[in-house]
Amino acid sequence: MRAVVQRVLKGSVTVNNEVVGKIGQGLVVLLGVGQGDCVDDARYLADKISQLRIFDDEQGKLNLSIQDVKGSILAISQFTLYGDCRKGRRPGYSGAAAPDTARELYESFVQRLVCNGLTTSTGVFQEHMVVEIINDGPVTLLLDSRKGF
């Protein structure tokens, strides 16, 4: 399971001209589910993201977590994180999980964030979404539950 984590001042996601998710200060998480991923991967990433110290403390040091700053998370599914661009000019997505499995694990990830006490908004799985964010920092991290990077 892969995640792109971006610290934001605010973010929103729109589907069919309707805002379906919106946050203020917090994190936007683009989550991709891969072949062979399981609920343990979802738990690992949700717990890791909940505790990452990537917000500034009083001295301007990255020392506070999303929980410490009482921020929110906007979680958006994104199978294209498993795009393989090594051959040709069109990405291949054979590394991405099947939609039913991906949906189940994405929902497990979101539920774990909520269980960790985080206010969490989402996009709509398998829909075309317009995502608007205002990056803060910028702070952008790549996480992989298999620790591939």
UniProtKB/Swiss-Prot annotation:
NCBIfam families found in the cross-reference section: D-aminoacyl-tRNA deacylase
Assembly and interaction partners: Homodimer.
Subcellular location(s) of the protein: Cytoplasm
Name recorded for this polypeptide: D-aminoacyl-tRNA deacylase
Classification via Pfam families: Tyr_Deacylase
Enzyme Commission identifier(s): 3.1.1.96
GO terms for biological process, alphabetical: D-amino acid catabolic process
Enzyme class: hydrolase
Keyword Hydrolase part of the UniProt annotation: yes
GO cellular component, one term: cytoplasm
Gene Ontology MF terms in the entry: D-tyrosyl-tRNA(Tyr) deacylase activity; Gly-tRNA(Ala) deacylase activity; Ser(Gly)-tRNA(Ala) hydrolase activity; tRNA binding
CDD domains xrefs: Dtyr_deacylase
Record keywords: Cytoplasm, Hydrolase, RNA-binding, tRNA-binding
Domain free text: A Gly-cisPro motif from one monomer fits into the active site of the other monomer to allow specific chiral rejection of L-amino acids.
Taxonomy, superkingdom: Bacteria
Cited function: An aminoacyl-tRNA editing enzyme that deacylates mischarged D-aminoacyl-tRNAs. Also deacylates mischarged glycyl-tRNA(Ala), protecting cells against glycine mischarging by AlaRS. Acts via tRNA-based rather than protein-based catalysis; rejects L-amino acids rather than detecting D-amino acids in the active site. By recycling D-aminoacyl-tRNA to D-amino acids and free tRNA molecules, this enzyme counteracts the toxicity associated with the formation of D-aminoacyl-tRNA entities in vivo and helps enforce protein L-homochirality.
Protein's gene: dtd
Protein family: Belongs to the DTD family.
Catalysed reactions, as listed in the record: glycyl-tRNA(Ala) + H2O = tRNA(Ala) + glycine + H(+); a D-aminoacyl-tRNA + H2O = a tRNA + a D-alpha-amino acid + H(+)
Sequence motif: Gly-cisPro motif, important for rejection of L-amino acids, positions: 137-138
